[in-house]
């Protein structure tokens, strides 16, 4: 029986490919990763980097959840990328009812926008806020006015 090696990590396939040293030194043939919130598959012919996507807050997939099923034919693993619609309005309602909206209104507004549109992840918005603040303060101390301005400029209501 020939044994295949797999590796699961929390990182992005884009970052892995840009890190040629990592890919060159990695002995595993299959690298399964996440964290980018987007499904994807890349291969250099020898190694395969597979991103399952995101169940909770996927990017580029509005009002849908993503997952992946790996199947083997005994020689190779093949990813099947799946996406299912779910009741985003109920999720947003539950965020409001949980009290999270009161505790972290900007995070909630960004999340609501992302769930509805599949666009503008939290990191992108945070970078915009920090740029408006001229990188003077750590993110948790940035004044609300910068958050409001950033969300307004990005079209997040």
Regions found by a protein language model. Give the residues of each.
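Residue-level preference for short coil/turn positions at secondary-structure junctions
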Residues: 1, 26-27, 45
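Single conserved hydrophobic/aromatic residue that forms the stacking wall/gate
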Residues: 1-9
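Generic hydrophobic/packing signal
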Residues: 5, 14, 29, 66-68
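Short, conserved active-site entrance elements at the starts or edges of catalytic domains
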Residues: 10-34
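Active-site neighborhood of phospho(di)ester-bond hydrolases with catalytic His/Asp-centered motifs
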Residues: 30-37, 49-53
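Residue-level recognition of beta-strand microenvironments
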Residues: 39-41
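Acidic, His/Gly-rich catalytic cores of divalent-metal-dependent hydrolytic chemistry
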Residues: 43-52, 56-157
């Amino acid at each position: 029986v020939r044994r295949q090696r797999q590796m699961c990590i929390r990182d992005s396939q884009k970052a892995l490919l840009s890190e040629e040293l990592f890919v060159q030194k990695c002995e595993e043939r299959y690298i399964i990763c996440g964290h980018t919130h987007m499904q994807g598959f890349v291969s250099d012919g020898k190694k395969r980097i597979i991103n399952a996507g995101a169940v909770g807050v996927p990017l580029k997939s509005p009002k849908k959840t993503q997952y992946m099923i790996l199947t083997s034919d005994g020689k190779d693993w093949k990813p099947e990328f799946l996406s299912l619609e779910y009741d985003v309005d109920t999720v947003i309602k539950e965020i409001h009812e949980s009290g999270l909206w009161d505790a972290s209104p900007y995070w909630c507004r960004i999340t609501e926008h992302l769930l509805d549109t599949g666009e503008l992840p939290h990191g992108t918005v945070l970078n915009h806020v920090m740029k408006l603040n001229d990188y003077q303060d750590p993110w948790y101390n940035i004044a609300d006015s910068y958050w409001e301005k950033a969300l307004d400029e990005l079209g997040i209501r």
